[in-house]
Amino acid sequence: MKREGCFWKGICMRYKSYSAYDSQGQSQIKEIYETSFPKSEKFPFWILKQCAKENNVHLNSIIDHNTDKIIGMSFLISYDDIAYLMYVAIDKKYRNKGFGSLVLKDLILRQADTSILLCIERPSTEKEDIKARRKDFYLRNCFYETGCFIEDSGVEYEFLSSSKERVITENDLKKRYSCMTRNPLIKFIIKNTFDSNINFID
């Protein structure tokens, strides 16, 4: 299903490929990425740019259709029957306005024939923990627990899915990295940035 944009509760937004921007627009997308994720969870941005040259990898801006301003970014990898949402972020100036919820709901509509997977840092048992609030946000917006937890470079992660009955396999997780690019050098860097061996935990 091809959709140019989406509208929900008075909010209207659309997407635009990173490669379609001039240097100023590209810098805005990079800044949102760099300021939205901890260093331990990020690839160097140039790797995202190179990987986005693949047909199955999408590095996009998220645009407020009413103002034509860049308000966020997303990085999505498609393989098999999975769309892996590696990164999605709304600029801090535009958070708590409904854009994040709209992005997730729209992605689920766009990827109706696939399971959207994403991972979050595993929450603690404290309800006020920011990680727990982040998880609750995804659960409120049509994502489900999968019971899949891994440890990578000393950080524990939990995987969520847009498909309620999705069973995540080791192969599913390995492919989220191996399908990012066909470039041997970048594959090597990716492999050495995050652990390519899947360490499942309880």
Give a label for each model feature.
Residues 4-46, 171-176, 188-195:
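Short amphipathic alpha-helix that is part of the acyltransferase structural core
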Residues 34-66:
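Active-site rim helix/loop that mediates acceptor-substrate recognition in acyltransferases
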Residues 61, 68-77, 82-89:
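Conserved beta-strand in the GNAT
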Residues 88-95, 122-124:
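A short, internal acetyl-CoA/4′-phosphopantetheine-binding micro-motif in the GNAT/acyltransferase core
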Residues 90, 96-110:
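Conserved acetyl-CoA-binding loop-helix of GNAT-fold acetyltransferases
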Residues 111-129:
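Conserved GNAT acetyl-CoA-binding A-motif
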Residues 119, 133-135, 139-158:
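Conserved catalytic-core motifs of GNAT/GCN5-like acyltransferases
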Residues 131, 151-202:
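C-terminal "cap" of GNAT-fold acetyltransferases
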